[in-house]
Design a protein with these regions (language model features):
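Low-complexity, highly charged intrinsically disordered N-terminal segments
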Residues: 1-76
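Flexible, active-site-adjacent loop/turn segments at secondary-structure boundaries
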Residues: 2, 45-46, 79, 84, ...
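A short acidic, often aromatic-flanked loop/helix-cap motif at beta-alpha or helix-coil junctions
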Residues: 9-22, 107-108, 185-190, 252, ...
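Exposed alpha-helical structural elements
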Residues: 14-17, 60-63, 166, 209, ...
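Short, compositionally biased "basic patch" segments
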Residues: 16-40, 82-93, 251, 349-356
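Acidic catalytic cores of enzymes that act on phosphate-bearing nucleotides/polynucleotides
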Residues: 46, 205-211, 218-336, 346-398
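Generic recognition of stable, solvent-exposed alpha-helical segments in well-folded globular domains
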Residues: 56, 63, 86, 90, ...
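Glycine-rich phosphate-binding loops that contact phosphosugars or nucleotide phosphates
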Residues: 63-222, 291-305, 346
Length: 398
């Protein structure tokens, strides 16, 4: 099910270590990433058996699909952030099924989703913790819209969350349909859990086919020529020289890989940052000295990976966890994500910072920060000159 175009040296120290680690990962050994990561790993390795565990989930998913069909709800809306929404979006793109994703508090995005076939919408609200502010805001917006339209929210909403979360408790009290997820699977590893499977099934995806491919791939990953070890060794060794590698992948799977790899490995001045491109002809895809990876698309890349979507999910999850061992980081925590949330909370508590005036104002463009230049062109030129050798420019679009 999975083929890689590149071989590795089986005698290398990294490869030998990864083959020693492989059977331990298969049995969910939490010691693979060191003593400091052990407590996190003990409660975050459920994804190893997610393909097999999905069989127990199928009857519940089928019942909810039937529930939506009985009510003639054929427009699927998914409210969720990050790992709660990326995988279903990729799955639906891959299978050519429509799904509306609400993964932002942008009023325009929420308003558009609410105005589109509201009476025929089944709204899936996914939050692992049950306390995600952005997702709760979207849920409240849809509840208000349903009530204003004379519709019962309980006839349209389905909740996916961890057992005993605040969201599960409130949803049951409100009479909503609830599907609980495996609490031992983190959001970015949840593609083959309730978070990935239910929204996709509601949209019409044959998730049984997806699961069969994932199970077959899992068996291949534990073999003597494991493609997970090959990919992990390449990624782990590459990180010693550069944090960046480019990915050319269809149907949005590159975006899913980006979050999985970057959030799992990026911390404490280490990690990998996938640069997702739209085609093998995109600028920078095959720059000298860079690692280029192409998925299900011939591109003459450094590494070409062939395999169905279910197999890709499993391969990248295993390879990412193993690469984190090579890099020397805990793949299951996200200190910078927590830091960002804390800083955002402080900004919201101190709204005077949000009303700060720009240092330079060019009408439609405002500049915050010190800069030498009297015109926009001069300011941008000064900014670009500050980018160090082998540095990068990040455009953060909100």
């Amino acid at each position: 099910l999975i083929t890689l175009s590149t071989a590795i040296d089986p005698a290398s120290e990294i490869v030998r270590d990864l083959f020693d680690a492989l059977p331990k990962l298969a049995v969910k050994d939490p010691s693979l990433w060191g003593e400091d990561a052990k407590s996190d790993a003990q409660t975050r390795l459920g994804w190893i058996s997610s393909p097999q565990d999905a069989a127990q989930l199928m009857p519940k998913v089928a019942a909810l699909v039937a529930w939506a069909a009985e009510r003639q709800l054929d427009h699927v809306v998914l409210c969720g952030m990050g790992g709660s929404s990326l995988a279903p979006e990729v799955i639906c793109k891959n299978y050519g099924k429509e799904i509306t994703i609400v993964d932002s508090t942008d009023p325009g995005q929420v308003r558009h989703a609410i105005s589109d076939r509201l009476s025929r919408s089944v709204v899936v609200v996914g939050s692992k913790s049950g306390s995600t502010i952005e997702t709760d805001s979207a849920k409240r917006a849809f509840e208000s819209a349903f009530i204003s339209a004379g519709l019962k929210p309980s006839d349209h909403l389905i909740i996916i969350t961890d057992p005993d979360s605040p969201l599960e408790k409130s949803a049951l009290a409100d009479g909503y349909q609830v599907l609980t997820a495996d609490p031992t699977v983190g959001g970015r590893y949840s593609a083959l859990t309730a978070f990935g499977l239910l929204p996709s099934a509601l949209a019409g995806v044959d998730i049984e086919n997806l699961i069969v491919d994932a199970i077959s791939a899992t068996n291949a990953l534990t073999a003597a020529d494991s493609p997970a070890v090959t990919l992990a060794a390449i990624l782990g060794a590459h990180e010693k020289f550069s944090p960046y590698f480019s990915v050319n992948a269809p149907h949005g799977i590159g975006d899913w890989i980006e979050q999985l790899v970057a959030e799992s490995t990026g911390k404490f001045d280490h990690g990998l940052l996938p640069i997702v491109v739209e085609s093998s002809e995109s600028p920078g895809f095959k720059e000298p000295g860079t690692l280029s990876i192409s998925i299900n698309s011939p591109a003459n890349a450094n590494l070409e990976i062939q395999g169905p979507l279910g197999a890709q999910f499993v391969l990248w999850e295993w390879a990412t966890a193993l690469a984190a061992r090579v890099i020397g980081v805990n793949p299951f925590d996200q200190p910078n994500v927590a830091e960002s949330k804390t800083k955002t909370g402080l900004m919201l508590e101190n709204t005077d910072q949000l009303s700060r005036k720009p240092d330079l104002d060019f009408g439609s463009v405002e500049i915050f920060g010190n800069s030498e230049g009297a015109t926009l062109v001069e300011v941008l030129g000064d900014f670009f000159d500050r980018i160090p050798a082998n540095g990068y420019l990040a455009l953060m679009v909100f």
